[in-house]
């Protein structure tokens, strides 16, 4: 299947970095099938985003991805971003009547450019690999285990086209903390790695129930480059998640769907005390002290219910309701 969409937005109810208006073009395609006894699925997504009149971001493409250490200026500017996303899934047949394996992969490459001094060109990529195994215990019970590894990197160059005027910008540390500086050029590198895993249980009888519990931990460094590396900060991002899904047919052969989700995320922002030291002709920034200076906690819980009146392999009516709880706590 393939899908082509055009979207636009406009209005004042927004965050400053989102822009007063914007538009994006999205192309999405996916397909799957069976190769011998193996199941395979894949998708490709391309989007081109134009963000107009954005403020307080002069560095990273996505300022809301959980990285508080980036640069900002007060020059309102447009951003042009492009994103390429690839997904794939492969599952094996069942071996020895109780064991099967799967592999989930994701790759994203993004390019972003700020259109006004300080002008920024940023390249972002992430790759995620998630192998898993499923153990069947009898006809009705299945147990799953998966492992996750992810790598994240973003490289960017900030540069003023008008080299005769030094641009003022700010090194952000989160929650409004910032250090004012100026210049006509700066390089930044963000490099992170993530590991995690999950446990699953499925009961398939008269009703079908799936329980999924997961945890992941990501550590990402923000560093100035390339000639004299210096830490801007480090984040330690921990994420706990849980999901319970139930598929329950009733006596009239209609269906009840219940889904509960829980997620708790904590980000520790680490800052450094550094000093430039020289040894003969060479020099480097030496770290004397580091500590957690900021914390960001987010907790979400949701409950959704749907009642489906079936009609053969389709449905004639679907009724649903849901509730969501969201709490955010940030400290510096």
Predicted features along the sequence, with ranges:
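Transmembrane beta-strands of outer-membrane beta-barrel pores
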Residues: 4-10, 46-50, 94, 105-111, ...
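Extracellular loop and loop/strand-boundary signature of outer-membrane beta-barrel proteins
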Residues: 13-17, 71-76, 113-119, 182-187, ...
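Membrane-proximal, glycine/serine-rich, low-complexity loop/turn segments characteristic
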Residues: 1-100, 126-127, 132-143, 148-150
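Short sequence motifs at beta-strands and strand-loop junctions characteristic
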Residues: 19-23, 74-83, 121-125, 187-193, ...
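Exposed, low-structure sequence patches enriched in small/polar residues
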Residues: 191-221, 235-332
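Short, flexible helix-coil linker/hinge segments at the edges of structured domains or between repeats
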Residues: 56-70, 148-191, 217-234, 274-281
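Outer-membrane beta-barrel translocator domains and adjoining extracellular loop/strand segments
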Residues: 12-19, 53-59, 112-120, 156-162, ...
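Membrane-embedded beta-strand positions of outer-membrane beta-barrel proteins
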Residues: 2-4, 42-44, 101-105, 131, ...
């Amino acid at each position: 299947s393939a899908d082509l969409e055009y979207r636009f937005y406009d209005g004042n109810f927004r965050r400053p970095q989102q822009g007063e208006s914007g538009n994006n073009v999205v192309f999405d395609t996916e397909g799957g099938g069976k190769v011998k006894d193996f199941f395979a699925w894949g998708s490709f997504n391309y989007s081109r985003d134009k963000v107009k009149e954005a403020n307080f971001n002069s560095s990273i493409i996505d300022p809301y991805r959980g990285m508080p250490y980036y640069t900002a200026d007060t020059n309102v500017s447009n951003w042009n971003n492009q994103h390429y996303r690839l997904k794939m899934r492969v599952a094996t047949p069942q071996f020895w009547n109780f064991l099967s394996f799967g592999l989930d992969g994701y790759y994203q490459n993004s390019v972003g450019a700020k259109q006004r001094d300080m002008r920024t060109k940023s390249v972002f990529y992430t790759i995620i690999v998630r192998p898993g195994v499923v153990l069947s215990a009898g006809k009705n019970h299945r147990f799953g285990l998966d492992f996750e590894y992810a790598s994240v990197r973003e490289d960017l160059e900030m540069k003023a086209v008008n080299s005769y005027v030094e641009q003022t910008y700010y090194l952000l540390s989160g929650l409004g903390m910032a250090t004012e500086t100026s210049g006509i050029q700066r390089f930044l590198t963000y490099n992170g790695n993530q590991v995690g895993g999950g446990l699953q249980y499925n009961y398939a009888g008269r009703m079908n129930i799936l329980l999924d519990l997961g945890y992941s931990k990501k550590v990402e460094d923000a560093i100035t480059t390339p000639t004299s590396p210096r830490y801007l900060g480090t984040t330690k991002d921990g994420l706990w998640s849980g999901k319970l899904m139930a598929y329950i047919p009733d006596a009239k052969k209609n269906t009840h769907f219940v889904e509960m989700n829980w997620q708790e995320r904590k980000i520790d922002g680490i800052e450094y005390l550094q000093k430039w030291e020289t040894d003969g002709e060479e020099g480097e920034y030496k770290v004397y002290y580091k500590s957690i200076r900021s914390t960001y906690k987010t907790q979400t819980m949701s409950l959704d219910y749907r009642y489906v009146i079936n009609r053969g392999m389709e449905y004639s009516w679907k009724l649903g309701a849901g509730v969501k709880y969201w709490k955010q706590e940030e400290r510096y």
